A protein has these predicted regions:
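Basic/aromatic-rich interaction segments and small domains that mediate binding to polyanionic partners
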Residues: 1-14, 18-21, 28-110
Length: 111
């Protein structure tokens, strides 16, 4: 069973690339894991998605994050499913629909 509709995922990816940078909030589980790394110990939940890529059906849409911690810090890359996007962003409904669909498919696949 495919997790994504590749055409829909790539269409969303292209719209997100055109809209970058996009403000987002890290979900608590991801933020805790990130803060366990010394380079991100002071990272707040708010970040900026500076770039997006599609990693195929297995990886989905991934986002490169900027926490504004200064030059020389690594830029973490995370699945879009670990982020929340502001509801007033023009792509928020499309992003939320993609996230919901992907999470549902991942749960079905692991059941």
């Amino acid at each position: 069973m495919a997790l994504d509709d590749p055409d829909a995922a790539i269409a969303l990816l292209e719209r997100m690339l055109a809209a970058c940078p996009i403000e987002a909030t890290c979900l608590p589980g991801f933020l805790s894991m990130l803060r366990a790394q010394a380079a991100f110990a002071t990272a707040g939940p708010r970040c900026v998605v500076s770039k997006v890529n599609y990693m195929g059906d297995g990886g989905g849409i991934v986002c490169r994050l900027d926490f504004g911690l200064g030059e020389g810090k690594p830029a973490p890359v995370v699945s879009i499913t670990h982020l929340l996007f502001d509801g007033d962003h023009p792509l928020s409904d499309d992003i939320a629909a993609y996230q919901k669909h992907r999470i549902t498919r991942l749960r079905e696949q692991s059941a």
